[in-house]
Amino acid sequence: MNAPAKFSTSQIRSDFLAFFEGKGHTIVPSAPLVPGNDPTLLFTNSGMVQFKDVFLGAEKRSYVRAADVQRCLRAGGKHNDLDSVGYTARHHTFFEMLGNWSFGDYFKKDAIAWAWELLTQVWKLPADRLLVTVYHTDEEAFELWRDMIGIPESRIVRIGDNKGAPYASDNFWQMADTGPCGPCTEIFFDHGDHIAGGPPGSPDEDGDRFIEIWNLVFMQFDRQPDGTLVALPAPCVDTGMGLERLAAILQHVHTNYEIDVFQALIGKASALTGIADLENKSLRVIADHIRACSFLIVDGVLPSNEGRGYVLRRIIRRALRHGWMLGVRQLFFSKMVPTLVELMGEAYPELVVAQETVARALLAEEERFAETLDAGMKIFDDVASRSQEIIPGADAFRLYDTYGFPVDLTADIARERGMRVDMEGFEFAMERQRETARAAGKFGGGVALPADLVATMAPTVFLGYEAQDADALKVVALLKQGRPVDRAEAGDEVIVFTDRTPFYAESGGQVGDSGQLSGTDVSIEVADTQKFAGQFHGHVGRIAEGALKLGDVLSGGIDVQRRGKTILNHSATHLLHAALREVLGTHVQQKGSLVAPDRLRFDFSHFQPITAEELAVIERKVNAEVRTNHSVEVHNMAMQEALDFGAMALFGEKYGERVRVLKMGGYSTELCGGTHVSRTGDIGLFKITSEGGVSSGVRRIEAVTGQGALDYVAEEERRLGEAANLLGGNSTEIVDKVRALTDRQKRLERELESLKAKLASGATADLGASAVDVAGVKVIAVRLEGFDAKALREAMDRLKQQLGDSVIVLAGAAGGKVALVAGVNGSPTGKVKAGELLGHIASQIGGKGGGRPDLAQGGGEDGPALATALQGVPSWVKQHLG
């Protein structure tokens, strides 16, 4: 039997797309690893994710046939292969899925015929090495394989409901308990009888002899709530074929880690770590994880302590720990990126564009974890040595909280040693910390609308895009002290819900409007407007006069000046976001914001501090767009239309079928439901007031606009002038004068240190003569005015050299505080411990301290007790010398 032809991974990709393009398919780019509009899914884990809305009928595409190579990730959440990666032949965090799709066009006959043609005629796989499965009642697929393709019945396996329920089968696909579903047929490659394992459906099907290549799903039914299947009017086809396992077959190797892409990455990891054994499992882990980490960063995810960013952090740290296991103590992981770009950059140009960003983000995380990895491993070793089979949950939490060890990393290490982590104990410790954080963060009780009340209300109609005041606002709900009421009176604190309102409810970072509601004989001062249940605007305020009841009709007007200042800041955040992405890179994503009348705050993903030069460029770019005075356009459109329009959606946000797109010239296009200026020039001036870190991988910029920015600049100029006056010059001379002042200060500090050293030298010479002899040991316990801890240590060293066998206590007093140093030199060290002596003294002056047997440090309060404590030192020493 002739061996099949050999194909590179790159050629397999291009062959697949070219083949289906020739069959009339539109070639669709891979979707990002972060699903664009599915908050229920952590990562894109299959080819069908980007077409989900098409299959559900919620979206129409311009084509009915499609083919793609989809990058996928399975790590975290329901689909998690992380623990198996590196230890099995075919598990990966990142993988590529080849797929062809029919949306109500061709069906089983063409799907089966084309799959067979590609496998046997293009890639030359021997037909007698292929086996197929079908759902046990799918006679159409069975007959197509037997009669059209010519596969013997002995190599067509019927698979029934093998998962304990009707239609619960390896060969029946369903998106959920109801909705589109249908049978599938799978194609397997037979590695030969020299490999252990049986065919699918047999007791030993989990062996490695028969490997699934391709799954063809035929969506032909709509499953009803009662479990019955109704035929779909336009059946669809969804196929998926794992590139890595197909490449293993076409390259004549048995594991995915032996294919060309992985061999190149493993080779690079080998060179960086100095490990020559290319089958080493840790090298496999590193090779797998560099792909997952790099493409996550390409798709806008950065390491953090929550959500997708935390999954990325876990994968990076797992790779770093495997490097540590190999004895690597230098930074290495980010150096894998150029090799990955060489291998996959042609297929994914976005990887080439983001290469520098990927390398910098990985390096920053590598440097961060390197600081705690060694210490954390020592803690783990200590815990493991004291435990039999279980790592206590409290210790696993300490490794997570203090040393940055994700719990699955700790579990990974434990498993290698035949141990396990007490996950219940870990979750208990984690929840206890969450409760502490929640308690610390509480500033007032939350109020929710009762479900029965929500059921009777229609979503509030927001009028505030066009109007600042409105009449005929009907009161549809009224809360007092968090409970629904029919009536409230003057002095009552209330939340008023009307059917319509010009008041913006806090969302998207923009604060809620304040203002006034009024009606016949009633006036309500609105301090804030909040959104309840995502769709009801609640006016939070106090009834100033009169009484209010359900059904009343009100007029309302917002605080126009407050709203005016707020919209300047909101529009500026959009320009700032665009400028950050232009200057720092497209990895920048909004992570949070506050848009208030007096300032704006913008949190974003970035892995290192922003330099002063970068900050200046960002500010200049925003102000340039302000001066350009672009018209601000608002468009309402379907979600997909908005994305095609170039609108930026925020990762993790859930959007409706129709969205509001805000466009500022050609500079910024984002989805946004907030209120904004008409032209960018309305912002006037944009001024950054601060920049700093919020958490790992998240930075924060605060800024002011309009009159607030002018006021800020004026205050800065006033302070500059005041500083110039203090320095005896004008503002243009400040830098030179401050530099001269700093140089003078440094010179004086050096002179002061020199004088202190001379003083200490002279003082120690005099002190030596005052030593008390206690059983042949010289004892000194004195107070030294103006001596800090450093000067005390220097004096201690001189006295030890001068006195020989000695016990010395020095107290430096300054500003009501006392620094203490105790030393034991020579023969007394066996009986007198410096740490115990210092603790004895410190306890008498309201302080504490400790240290080694020969040297200890501490401190306390200055006062009469110090003299008494020092006077008692000779007696204490005598007692301990025996």
UniProtKB/Swiss-Prot annotation:
Catalytic activity: tRNA(Ala) + L-alanine + ATP = L-alanyl-tRNA(Ala) + AMP + diphosphate
SUPFAM superfamilies xrefs: Class II aaRS and biotin synthetases (SSF55681), Putative anticodon-binding domain of alanyl-tRNA synthetase (AlaRS) (SSF101353), ThrRS/AlaRS common domain (SSF55186), Translation proteins (SSF50447)
InterPro entries referenced in this protein's UniProt entry, alphabetically: aa-tRNA-synth_II/BPL/LPL, Ala-tRNA-lgiase_IIc, Ala-tRNA-ligase_IIc_anticod-bd, Ala-tRNA-synth_IIc_core, Ala-tRNA-synth_IIc_N, Ala-tRNA_ligase, Ala_tRNA_ligase_euk/bac, DHHA1_dom
Subcellular location: Cytoplasm
GO molecular function: alanine-tRNA ligase activity; aminoacyl-tRNA deacylase activity; ATP binding; tRNA binding; zinc ion binding
GO biological process: alanyl-tRNA aminoacylation; negative regulation of DNA-templated transcription
Enzyme class, broadest EC rank: ligase
CC cofactor note: Binds 1 zinc ion per subunit.
GO cellular component, one term: cytosol
Similarity-based family: Belongs to the class-II aminoacyl-tRNA synthetase family.
Role noted for this protein: Catalyzes the attachment of alanine to tRNA(Ala) in a two-step reaction: alanine is first activated by ATP to form Ala-AMP and then transferred to the acceptor end of tRNA(Ala). Also edits incorrectly charged Ser-tRNA(Ala) and Gly-tRNA(Ala) via its editing domain.
Listed NCBIfam families: alaS
Domain notes: Consists of three domains; the N-terminal catalytic domain, the editing domain and the C-terminal C-Ala domain. The editing domain removes incorrectly charged amino acids, while the C-Ala domain, along with tRNA(Ala), serves as a bridge to cooperatively bring together the editing and aminoacylation centers thus stimulating deacylation of misacylated tRNAs.
The name this protein goes by in its record: Alanine--tRNA ligase
Organism: Xanthomonas campestris pv. campestris (strain ATCC 33913 / DSM 3586 / NCPPB 528 / LMG 568 / P 25)
Lineage: Bacteria, Pseudomonadati, Pseudomonadota, Gammaproteobacteria, Lysobacterales
Annotated gene: alaS
